């Protein structure tokens, strides 16, 4: 009785040997190692695919690509920028009368000055066969609908002078919301048209903004001082002390403290207000060399970009 062996009957499923285990036992050690490595490789590929498709703040949601279109004007080297300030509605006075413009209250009487800026750009264009004239300015005015400053300036320029040869060397940059973007985005637009970056830049704007363009925006894009020029045209009779003080308070000081308009409340607010139709440029795609500069917003907002640029 004491020598009788105790037998425990296990459930049927517990006594079965998995077919996969039998398969594994019949394999040679070398085959097992190969299968394990292959399975590990598959898992790594799956993990990499999942990780690469996840959303990361530092990753771009686009890929730089080449433009498909007309042949680039590779013989052009001189960028002429006419910075937009308002939207021209059209009319028989060629912009000389304020009624042809959508103006802010403080711009009263300046319509003819904007027309002079356009004429100056055309004069510079006609004097240099290697130049490209870019009218810069976005869809900044609610009252104008989705019509850009740049397109209206271009239309005015064609009404003033529709010469075919000159028309082929003028274009628009339709996303700028402030004077820094007038410069930087026009450089990007120049590249889109020519497949190269400018060797020389000339900006046409108000003369009282000279310091802003020459000493702040030029420095912000690291363009050589001796290759950057400015043509200033103010209203007849000059500008008031109040205008100069407004320039100092609303532009010189803010852009000195924050050259790229990343965090200064006044500059940030202006950009938001000047984009009522929520437009976004494509220069991050078409101008990959400019991505670091276009996205530059340092922790110290007064710090200038010191990376490598194609000029």
From Swiss-Prot:
It is found in: Membrane. It comes from the Eukaryota. The keyword rRNA processing does not apply. GO terms for cellular component: cytoplasm; cytosol; membrane; nucleus. The keyword Transmembrane applies. InterPro entries: C57A10.07/YOR238W. Keywords: Membrane, Transmembrane, Transmembrane helix. Coiled coil: none annotated. The chain crosses the membrane at residues 34-54, 76-96. One of its GO terms (molecular function) is catalytic activity. It is a multi-pass membrane protein. To yeast YOR238w. This is Uncharacterized protein C57A10.07.
């Amino acid at each position: 009785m004491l020598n009788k062996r105790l037998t425990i009957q296990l459930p049927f499923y517990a006594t079965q040997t998995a077919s996969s285990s039998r398969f594994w036992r019949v394999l040679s050690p070398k085959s097992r190692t190969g299968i394990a490595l292959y399975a590990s490789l598959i898992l790594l590929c799956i993990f990499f695919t999942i990780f690469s498709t996840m959303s990361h703040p530092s990753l771009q949601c686009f890929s730089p690509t080449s433009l498909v279109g007309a042949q680039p004007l590779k013989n052009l080297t001189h960028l002429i920028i006419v910075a937009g300030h308002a939207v021209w509605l059209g009319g028989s006075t060629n912009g000389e009368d304020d009624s042809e413009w959508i103006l802010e209250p403080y711009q009263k009487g300046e319509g003819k000055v904007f027309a002079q800026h356009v004429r100056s750009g055309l004069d510079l264009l006609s004097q240099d066969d290697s130049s490209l004239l870019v009218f810069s300015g976005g869809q900044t005015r609610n009252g104008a609908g989705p019509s850009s400053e740049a397109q209206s300036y271009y239309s005015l320029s064609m009404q003033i002078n529709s010469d075919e040869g000159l028309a082929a060397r003028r274009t628009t940059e339709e996303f700028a919301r402030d004077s820094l973007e007038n410069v930087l985005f026009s450089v990007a637009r120049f590249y889109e048209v020519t497949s190269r970056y400018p060797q020389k830049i000339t900006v046409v704007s108000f003369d009282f903004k000279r310091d802003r363009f020459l000493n702040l925006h030029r420095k912000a894009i690291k363009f050589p001082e001796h290759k950057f020029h400015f043509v200033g045209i103010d209203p007849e009779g000059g500008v008031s002390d109040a205008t100069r003080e407004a320039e100092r308070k609303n532009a010189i000081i803010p852009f000195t403290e924050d050259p790229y308009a990343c965090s200064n409340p006044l500059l940030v607010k202006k950009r938001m207000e000047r984009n009522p139709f929520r437009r976004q440029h494509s220069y991050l795609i078409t101008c990959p060399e400019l991505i670091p500069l276009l996205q530059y917003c340092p922790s110290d907002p007064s710090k200038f970009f010191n990376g490598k640029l194609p000029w």
